[in-house]
Amino acid sequence: MLGIDMELILQPSLPHQQTGVDAVADVFANTAIKSPVMFYANPEITLSKDGVGQNIVAIQKRNSIQPENCAYFHDASCLNLDIKMETGTGKTYVYTRTMYELHKRYGINKFIVAVPTLPIKAGARQFMEDGYVKRHFRDVCGYDAEIELLTLEPPKKKKKGRQYFPAAVSEFVKGSNRDTKKIYVLLVNMQLLKVAKNYMLSRDDYGSVTEGFYRPFDALRATRPFVIIDEPHKFSRDQKAFGVIKEEINPQCIIRYGATFPETVSGRGKN
């Protein structure tokens, strides 16, 4: 039997992929950005109708988005962006490159990537940790930074003894915005996004703390992250996991990538 080593071949600037990257990054062009007070937090982007709102309208027109798909509802606390990409067109590549681009343009260095299933989680992890992928973004795309991926896993069952703050969350939070060559990414599957007694992200009785935080959800909230959601049709706004992201993590921005998006009912119609 022959052993064959195969490397993923990536092509830079495929038109549909570049369009997806620019569509997100351009949303924040010429908007007010406040420098973070704490070393573990993202810069704070001002979400105004005159800034972000006008940019979104211009991007939709530029990309000839159909009027029925151009809804924009202003929310000053959290911006929600939906990026439609057909299956097999490189969503993982696009959202990974988008993180690099947002870091390059605006200094955003804390991202949480939420996926619906373990196979998708494994695929995303393999892609972002791959040496060839890292070299591609550095040497071909010219990004002067590297992703440090922290993957959240369920805790091993312990009958007795001290419980420790989740290591992936701790390392993610401790990542400093002063290190301009690092982009910190926390990868989670939706089953871990729960609020329940003694559950890993919502409990506050750990034997250690991270930057003064006893509760992992509170620590994540303090980083003011951007959240990326893959496969939103499996991760609808009506599900508890999405509510946990909104209420417990309270990100500045939620970016959903998918081929289909679940409909939500409003009054007698659907949105």
List each model region and its residues.
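N-terminal accessory segments
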Residues: 1-51, 55
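Conserved, well-structured beta-alpha core segment at the onset of a catalytic domain
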Residues: 1-15, 30-32, 98-110, 115-118, ...
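Pre-Walker A adenine-sensing motif
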Residues: 24, 52-75
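Walker A/P-loop
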Residues: 74-98
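Short loop/turn elements that form and flank the Walker-type P-loop nucleotide-binding site
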Residues: 77, 107-108, 180-182, 221-223, ...
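Conserved Walker A/P-loop ATP-binding site and its immediately adjacent core
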Residues: 92-94, 107-154, 189-194
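Signature of the SF2 helicase/ATPase Hel1-core->accessory helical subdomain module
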Residues: 93-104, 118, 122-126, 190-271
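Inter-Walker segment of RecA-like/P-loop motor cores
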Residues: 135-209
